[in-house]
């Protein structure tokens, strides 16, 4: 029973699987709302839609629901969290200030200058927009991969992408083709589920087009794998 205890803030970090499955997040927020309450700021790091967080803010009235988008990958995530250089917190203003003070006191590279506060729906939309931008960048360089081949360039594509990324406005992140997983297009846990959900709630023709184009790029992976396997079988048969 936590009802008699006072918490400065509570942080929630649970998975929200593809399909905007917020079952676990709802369960956790419901229990915190019931058993902790006390108008406690509850900072959620889980990705979900602006609509979800707007509704959560209104539904769980014994707590103050906040959203702070997470930007970690599975590699070195603890170290990356400890060394993050910016942070966004969305929700009721005084609760945001309390949570930002917690972050500043414990994370050495965060200051009041690089922590940004806003409303909860904006914070949620920022995460989706950034992941869509990164996915779109991957899509662009997958298209450039084919254009580079068709134009008869003497450089390798890796040389080409590094040259393109020499302009600091572009950079080389999310330009490797095939990607780190050896496949075309973008995949992974976050880009896949977040851009799928963004397509569903944004009602944007551009988002739908890029997601569908990425599905085409991902399909090439299987075609190339089959071709490589077929070529290998032919070589083995001729040896």
Predicted feature locations:
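Structural/interface elements that position substrates and couple domains in central-metabolism enzymes
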Residues: 1-239
